[in-house]
Amino acid sequence: QVELRDPHANYNKMDRATLKKNFPTFDWDTYFTVSGLKDLEEVNIGQPAAMKEVADVINTVSLDDQKLYLQWGLIDAAASYLSDDFEAQNFDFYSRTMSGKKEMQPRWKRSVSTVDGVLGEVVGQMYVEKYFPAAAKERMVTLVKNLQTSLGERIKGLEWMSEPTKEKALEKLATFHVKIGYPDKWKDYSALEIKDDSYWANIERANEWDYNEMIAKAGKPVDKDEWLMTPQTVNAYYNPTTNEICFPAAILQPPFFDM
């Protein structure tokens, strides 16, 4: 757990040659080609020890057992989107037995949750249009900037903090990235095709779209304006990796806050 919380221990950048040298039992060329990353030159291996164990398992477990495991994984992931018997078994184990829930949510709630998960920023645009006008965002941005200024003045006046520490604190405050209400640029879902053929088929296409969006980021600079939450999410977050804080529109509504 200590190592998992250490950002330095989880940053192990390697080129392909080093990757093959450190984990020679894994077929990296095939992996990158099938994954759509054949031109990727460098990767970060968050946990090298775990990767070694995975490579060893792949080379010691029989191919039939690996296929069986992947088949089970697919069925397990799809269960809540299939017929009633699959859905009931999935709920009975994961929700009733493991979590103590008494009954399944009504279908309309489950459907809304799925749409919210797949088309989060489409729903977000509708939510913002109705509940969070641009003027509310501008007021909140001004409020946060005032708080940043006030915090900077407090840091400068702290008697117990050393000057080098103050400099670091002010440097961090100056690079603080604030996200308020909703993204300035919405996601483009035009490549995602929604059909009336089957629920699961739409989930598959949504997963493929999500995967392609993720793969398209490989080898490119981090988009610091990308949101990790949707505007309609009643929550907020601070991301220490990018030194950013995010307040979605929904958390800026009564009873939490009133713009």
Task: Please name every model-derived segment.
Residues Q1-T142, N146:
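Noncatalytic, helix-rich "gating/capping" subdomain that lines the substrate-entry/channel surface
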Residues D197-M259:
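Active-site-adjacent "gating/activation" loops or surface patches in catalytic cores
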Residues G157, I180-D188:
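Amphipathic alpha-helical coiled-coil segments
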Residues Q1, M140-L151, I155, A169-I180:
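Short amphipathic alpha-helical coiled-coil/interface segments
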Residues A9-L19, S190-Y211:
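Long, compositionally biased
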